[in-house]
Structure formats: C-alpha cells, structure tokens
A protein has these predicted regions:
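A glycine-centered beta-loop-beta connector
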Residues: 27, 35-51, 101, 109-125
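Short acidic-hydrophobic, aromatic-tinged amphipathic segments that line or gate anion-handling sites
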Residues: 14-15, 88-89
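Short proline/glycine- and acidic-rich turn/helix-capping motifs at secondary-structure junctions
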Residues: 176-184, 215-225
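Conserved short beta-strand edge segments in small beta-sheet-based binding/regulatory domains
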Residues: 170-172, 202-222
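Short, basic/aromatic recognition patches
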Residues: 18-25, 96-98
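Short acidic/polar active-site loop segments enriched in Thr and Asp
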Residues: 33, 107, 168
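Tandem CBS (Bateman) regulatory domains
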Residues: 1-10, 49-86, 93-102, 123-164, ...
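Short basic, glycine-rich beta-strand/loop surfaces that mediate nucleic-acid
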Residues: 183-192
Length: 225
C-alpha cells in the first residue's frame, strides 16, 4: 500500500512567518495536530500542538482566545517550529511511514512528490485506519490466530481446510515476530460460515495446529487456547 492512497490531502499548511495565533486557529478549525511551515512553496519546518505548548502558548483547548492580548500568540511560527522536518514521498509504502514514525518518535509526516512539493500529510491516525482496513476489522467476521510450523504451504493447508467447511477467506496476516523458532504466527479472518461448521472447523484445526485464539465478531464470542 502506497502513502498516496492513505494520506490526508490537501495538506493544511501555514506560513513560517505567521503568528502562533494563526497556527492555533488552523489546528482548531481542521482538528489536526501539526502543520507544515512554508516559505512560499518551500517546506522549511513543521509546527505541532506540542511545539505550541513548549513555546509558551496558552492552552488553546481552554477558553483562551487565539485573538486575545497574550504577547506569546504574536510570536512567529519559525521561532518554535522544528526545522528540516522528516518527510516521505507519496510513492513510498505505509510500512516505510510506520518505520519513520517509530524511529523519529513523531506523530506524522509531510508527504512530498518528486518535485519536493508538499501534497499531503500522513499521521499515526492514517496508519491505524490502514491497519483496521487491511486486517478486516471494519467488517464482521471470525478471526483465527494460530502458530504454524514455518514451511512452504503451511498457510494454504489451513485456508483450504477453512474453505472445505464453507468459509470465505477475508484477510491473512503472518509474522515470525514473537513466534517460536521454526514457527510463524498466522491471523486469518473468515466470513460466511454457519455455527455448526465453525464449531467443527475449530475442533479439527485444534488437532492439527497450535491454536492461539478464535474471536467471533459476529456473535461477540472469543475462545482462548
């Protein structure tokens, strides 16, 4: 999945010479937490709600008005912004984004095109939205979690068995992280299976693989192994 498919666009930006009051107004109006700071079309920094608090701006979630007399609100954004912010290209992947957010311990990134123009923003919220969609959490279904011997065809054997019981495969996620050596963990979401068939499937799978849990989102039931 590419950044351009999940980023928020267009980017809400602010001039680096604008006042803190202007930044506060934009953050509140658009319900966002960060703004790319610009000099014309050139990205020169980024300012976040945390930067504003560290810079001494009043708590703008309170009744303080951005247009009030507080002199701190008249400071230029460039005085508190983070210069040379980390960016990401629109044709990079969501995985690249998540890695940068973790490494730099930041909430989001300006998205640029090949010409260096800011065309959007991607934040942790966008990453969460991607995860919810990718693993099928936005829809009902039944999630199986299991640990499999890490060999060719191990996941196909399980999904073939699920189909034999009438299930439709929704999403599959597999990882070696936190699995025992020589194993992998698989998370498979299925749909369109009746309760008797589901019960038999769980019983058969439990005899063949190391089941971790089954969560039936349709019935609000879970079984931990």
């Amino acid at each position: 999945m590419l950044v351009k498919n999940w980023m928020s666009k267009p980017a809400i930006t602010v001039n680096a010479d604008a006042k803190l009051a202007d930044a506060i107004s934009l953050l509140e109006k658009h319900e966002i937490h960060m703004l790319p700071a610009m000099e014309g079309t050139r990205l020169v920094g980024i300012v976040t709600d945390q930067d504003l608090k560290r810079g001494g701006a009043p708590d703008y979630s309170s009744s303080t008005s951005p247009n009030g007399p507080d002199n701190r609100l008249q400071m230029a954004i460039r005085e508190i912004m983070t210069m040379n912010p980390v960016t990401i290209y629109d044709n990079q992947t969501i995985e690249d984004t998540a890695q940068l957010l973790l490494v730099h311990k930041i909430l989001g990134l300006p998205v640029i095109n090949l010409f260096g123009e800011v065309i959007g923003m991607i934040t942790k919220s966008d990453i969460f939205r991607f995860i919810v969609t990718a693993i099928g959490m936005s829809k009902d279904g039944i999630q199986f979690a299991m640990e499999l011997v890490d060999r060719s065809g191990c996941i196909k054997e399980v999904t073939d068995m699920m189909r034999d019981y009438g299930a439709r495969i929704g999403t599959i996620f597999a990882t070696h992280e936190r699995a025992k050596r020589g194993y992998r963990q698989a998370y498979i979401r299925i749909y369109d299976i009746d309760q008797p068939s589901l019960a038999r499937l769980v019983e058969v799978l439990s005899e063949k693989v190391n089941m971790l849990y089954v969560i039936n989102c349709q019935e609000g039931m879970s079984e931990i192994f």
